[in-house]
Amino acid sequence: MTRTVLREVRVYRDGAFGAPEDLVVDGGLIDSAPADGPGAVSGGYLVPGLIDCHVHLYGPETLSALAAHGVTTGLDMSSPAPLVAALRGLPGTTDIRSPLMAANSPASAHAARMKDIPAFDDALVAGATHADAWVDRHAEQGADFIKVVIDLPGFDQETVDALVGAAHARGLKVVAHAARSDAVAMAQRAGVDVLTHAPLDRPVGPDQAAELVATGTVIVPTLAMMQGIVENLAAKGVPGPVYEPARASVATLHAAGMPILAGTDANATPAAPASPVFGESLHDELALLVDAGLTPAEALDAATGIATEHFGLADRGRIAPGLRADLVLLADDPTVDISATRTVRGVWIAGERVVGAP
């Protein structure tokens, strides 16, 4: 790996950019050595590599699209084990984590929509008595966490509880697909670690928000996806939900102190109710988070340091010596205007420049 010097960059730390400084990258890590030698770039705003906490892998082109928009880590939320294995650790591409296939009830609407996806049978859990074996199989195949789709109709509470208990017994966090308020309540009773999606039917209220915060639950609201669902149904003339409950839920949860993580639900699945675009949609998501009440710096943290804290990615998400050199150089300051995350001048993944002139 080559040694790289970035000169006169303003580095994002603790919610703000500092005075211009020189930064050294060596061996794929951020180095504290003196910044001697020629500089690869000069000037700009340097932020940690962005993390999309909800994507669905499709192929190498998925990773290329993510990287082009500054997304250096993607948290897949349901993909067949062979696909995940083929995409893990590819040099110079977005790094990934995955639960492999998400747990689905054979009776759920989600399963009916997704039944033609390759290896979807591996996602099905017949009931609570099958939870241990299902989680064991996914853990043995290398799942980084477990995802449970809570759909109504779908799993009963006993099965959700069993899946969460089996995952926690193996030291794995649990992400719950919960796009309706009753699904959020089921996830809450089961003690999941991460909620994904913000409900479209009814907003989370202050009391429930306080209870969720007390248990340490966090949320990836995927506002870009929720907005896309609403817009797609409206375009078809189909009576459906409105976006405001999702936005209001984020505002309430944020006010209650819940950590908000940025994720899009980017996918290329024909049966999906909406398909946010890989990479580009994360910038849309950050803007929607700001619209829901986060400051631009809080939205940026939702796609960097806060995301790493809750998915066990301690080697990234901040800019400090010894950490993985996943970096994005911007032309403008995103703490002033969050749309500046789109002004990408350069992207480094594990110290290798993948966007911008070498």
Which role fits each region the language model picked out?
Residues S64-L172, Q208, T215-G228, N232:
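Divalent-metal coordination cores built from histidine and acidic residues
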Residues V9, P321-P358:
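C-terminal cap of metal-dependent C-N hydrolases
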Residues A246-L330:
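His/Asp/Glu-enriched, well-ordered alpha-helical/loop segment
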